[in-house]
Each structure stands twice: as C-alpha cells, then as structure tokens.
A protein has these predicted regions:
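Residue-level signal for the membrane-embedded core of alpha-helical transmembrane segments
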Residues: 21-31, 132-135, 139-142, 177
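Hydrophobic alpha-helical transmembrane segments of polytopic membrane proteins
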Residues: 169-183
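Hydrophobic membrane-targeting segments
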Residues: 1-55
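Periplasmic/extracellular loop-to-transmembrane helix junction in inner-membrane transport proteins
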Residues: 10-13, 161-165
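Transmembrane alpha-helical segments in integral membrane proteins
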Residues: 32-36, 179-190
Length: 223
C-alpha cells in the first residue's frame, strides 16, 4: 500500500510534461497487454487446431467423407480451409498436373491471407517495444532538467533538494521499460510462432499433393 501511495505521490508531484508522459506510457502498456493476450490466445488456438486436424485427417480412411463434412461449414480456417479448397481444385482438374498447379496457386493465396490475419496487432507491439523506452527517456530528461533548474532558486544545495525531482523523472524510464519489455517478448514469440504455423500449412499442402498424386497413379493403374 505504501508503494502505491508513493507512486501516486510521485505522479502528482511531477511536472505536467512528465505526467503526460506517464499517462501515455500507461495507455501504451495497457493496450499492448490486450494485444499480447489476444495474440497468445489466437496463436495457441491455431497451433492446437493444426495438431488436432492433422491427427484426425491422416487417421481418417475416407477423404471424401472428411471433405463433405468440412465443406458444409462456413468458418473453415487453417488446414481445414486449405484442404477444402485443395480438394475442390483436385476434383475439378482434368489431370494431376493441372490440379497441382491450381492447388499451389489457391493455397498460396489462402496461406498469405491467413498469415496477414495472424499478424494483426504485431506492428503495434513492435512500435510499443521500440518507442516506449524513448518516451520514458524523454520524461526522465525533462524531469531531471526541472529538478536541477530548481536548484538555482535555493541558497543551499543538498541531495534532499533534488532527490524528489529525480525520483519522479526516473519513474518515466521505469514505465517506458514496463511497456516495452513485455511487448518485445510477445512480438518475438508471435513472429516465431507464426513462422511455425505457416510452415505447417505449407508442409500439409505438400503432403496433400503427394496423396493426390498417389490417387492419380491408382486411377491410372486401374484404367
């Protein structure tokens, strides 16, 4: 409780500019935490969906049944959407060569769109991570300048005279780091996780093409 009161006292005792800096950093930190939580939920769900879909799909013995079940849904995303579009192109194509070309083009578009969707909010986290320390530093420099400018009005200089002003100024730096560090960690984790997800999409597409090629060989052999 004492720490909370101490911080409030520091905020109220700071100059208007430093107070504005603190408010801006609080807003940036709060907003970035919302994006951090949202990214964690979205990307964790995407990885879970990949695992569950691949497990069910490759264990399924009836690819047509799986396609019909998924084709009725309107909210396919990730591997399910890639499979539905790929299978539609495979059924429409006259031969495997044409099917392969159409599937590659269609899935490339889908994967790019899904990557854009997964990356939503990353630019904000990157901005917060890079800008917040400098905003905090600006508040600190401004506060220190005010603290030392006040010394000119004092007849006797002591550490007690400048300590409160410097403390208020350093709070701005601490808030800048408080906003930047979690945003940077979340950004790096999100970029790495998205890369893993996209590679999973691309690997599934390649494996699916191999499966369709085997189907084509079987049909040709029967003829």
């Amino acid at each position: 409780m004492q720490a909370e009161l101490s911080f409030i006292d520091l905020f109220l005792g700071a100059s208007l500019v430093v107070q504005l800096v603190m408010i801006i950093l609080f807003v940036l930190a709060g907003t970035s935490w919302w994006f951090i939580f949202d990214k964690w939920l979205t990307l964790s769900k995407a990885r879970k969906d990949i695992y569950e879909f691949e497990t069910d799909f490759w264990n399924s013995k009836n690819i047509e049944k799986t396609f019909n079940e998924l084709n009725r849904k309107e909210d396919n995303f990730g591997l399910s959407q890639i499979f539905v579009i790929s299978h539609e192109e495979f059924l429409k194509a006259e031969n495997f060569e044409k099917a392969e070309d159409r599937i590659n083009k269609s899935t490339e578009i889908i994967i790019n769109r899904q990557e854009e969707r997964l990356e939503e909010g990353l630019s904000f986290l990157s901005t917060v991570a890079s800008v917040s320390p400098f905003i905090g530093l600006f508040g600190t420099v401004w506060g220190v300048m005010n603290a030392f400018s006040g010394l000119a009005q004092l007849s006797q200089v002591s550490i007690n005279a400048v300590a409160p002003g410097i403390s208020e100024a350093l709070v701005a730096t601490a808030l800048g780091l408080f906003a930047a560090i979690p945003a940077l960690i979340s950004y790096n984790w999100s970029v790495k996780t998205i890369d893993i997800i996209i590679k999973s999409y691309e690997n599934f597409t390649s494996e699916l093409l191999i499966t369709y090629q085997e189907f084509n060989v079987q049909k040709t052999t029967k003829k």
